[in-house]
Amino acid sequence: GEAGTPFELMTQYPENKPAYSPRLMAAKLPIINVPTTPNSAVNRAGSGLKNPDLDHRMEYFDPKTRPHSVFLDEAVLLSSPPEVVRSTAATVFAGTLSSLSQTEQNPLVEGDHRQAFRLAHNAYLRLMNEIDNPALRIDLAMAAFLQNRAEDDGRRRFAGGPFSGNYAISTALHVRYP
């Protein structure tokens, strides 16, 4: 295990100073992610944990810990309860829909956004009637992955358009009311 309490290991936010990660220089093992739900963080570094005693997530961020590999396994994706999948699918679909409002995207970003929306839209419409269909969950997971990749490649997160303020609000609501 790591030395320190979760509060000592999470990203620190000292007053009037920049945030820093106490774990940044620690040795790292390769990370292999096998997600249970579609989420746009599967290929990102770090993680966030909800703590009911705090008004924000406990963040554990380290840019050196981007996953080495991501595996989408049907059985693992089917292990999530319908309520959880419905929630994450709604988040993925809303994110892909809002990305279509962005303008002046480079062709690679636009292609990822369009493919992510196509996958999410087709799967989302059928999901609750075919809750045990692994192909729909894989499509939603791929949509989330493509959406995240597009945001990384575009170097902006909902920087403009009618949905530009929704991300922060929806994240706060999702953390507060899971």
Which role fits each region the language model picked out?
Residues S99-P178:
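Active-site segments that bind and position negatively charged phosphate/pyrophosphate groups
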Residues G1:
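A phosphate-binding catalytic loop at a beta-strand-loop-alpha-helix junction
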